[in-house]
């Protein structure tokens, strides 16, 4: 779902991400000879993050914050030690620009499958999340899988 608002120089588009925190992405376009994206930022559709969820969903919530470029809220999910080790650039480059995320919880732990589109092919990367005291203490990349 998107909402379009006309501006003096182009338009503003709000797209709901339908994630746990109720993020929306605002894209501002300028209209000249072509339509150009001039700015993009995330907002909370409820005015603030909705972060009172089942803690088993913590890795999913974290990834959805990364996807929405809400790095401040994403870092809130990390342990104090890990929070001090990583910055916005590290998180952004570590996970890249993924299209979808899926969380699997089993007896071995918490695993997230992220799907990326690379040159028309879909690639799935899996990450293992280590959680202690309701915070993420480590994130480990697993084996990469390609699909057609």
How should each PLM-predicted stretch be described?
Residues 2-148:
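Acidic, small-residue rich beta-repeat scaffolds with periodic aromatic anchors
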């Amino acid at each position: 779902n998107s909402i379009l608002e006309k501006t003096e120089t182009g338009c503003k588009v709000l797209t709901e991400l339908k994630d746990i925190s109720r993020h929306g992405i605002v894209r501002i376009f300028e209209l000249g000879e072509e339509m150009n994206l001039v700015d993009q930022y995330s907002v909370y559709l409820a005015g603030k993050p909705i972060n009172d969820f089942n803690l088993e969903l913590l890795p999913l919530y974290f990834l959805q914050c990364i996807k929405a470029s809400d790095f401040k809220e994403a870092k809130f999910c990390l342990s104090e030690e890990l929070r001090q080790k990583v910055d916005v650039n590290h998180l952004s480059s570590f996970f890249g620009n993924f299209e979808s995320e899926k969380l699997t919880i089993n007896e071995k732990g918490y695993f997230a499958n992220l799907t990326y589109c690379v040159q028309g092919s879909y690639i799935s990367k899996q990450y293992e999340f280590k959680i202690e005291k309701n915070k993420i203490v480590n994130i480990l990349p697993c084996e990469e899988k390609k699909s057609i």
